[in-house]
Amino acid sequence: MTAAVKFLLIDLNRDEGLPPPLLALNNEFAQELSYLCPEKAAHLVREAAMACRVGEADALLLAFAQDAAYENPNFEWFRGRFERFIYIDRVVVAPAMRGRGLARALYTALFSRAEALNHSQVVCEINLDPPNPASDAFHASLGFEQVGLAVLPRAGKTVRYFSRKIG
């Protein structure tokens, strides 16, 4: 029997933005997440419905409510179709920390926060091209279902849109 592992989720200080180690973690995976400069990262943290980390830079999650001041084609896709939602903008786990349940712990906390804020669903996009099979499997295991598809020529990606009902 495997013992449950607990992680301390730490809310980011909205006045400080992303600490340098988290910014570096994000930018290490810029192809999947998109590159962030310190100013853009600070704006995202201020606007987020949930901005949290595990450890100094073990994992990061940023998610936005539908009324956030956030310009992003994927976020806009959801805003045009759903009334109330939490949009997962980015989640990243440091390579050395993968497979330990950090992403699942972040999502579990997000689902609880979304329910507490009376949101009906949590949404996200997953790259189809370039493919991200690990993300596909992870989101399927959490009950996400595909609700749309888009080609993003400026980003050089094709994405699928997913939703998970809350409550």
What are these regions (language model features)?
Residues V93, G99-S112, S141:
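Conserved acetyl-CoA-binding loop-helix of GNAT-fold acetyltransferases
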Residues T2-E39, G55-D58:
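Short amphipathic alpha-helix that is part of the acyltransferase structural core
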Residues M50-C52, R84, T158-F162:
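Short beta-strand micro-motifs in enzyme catalytic cores
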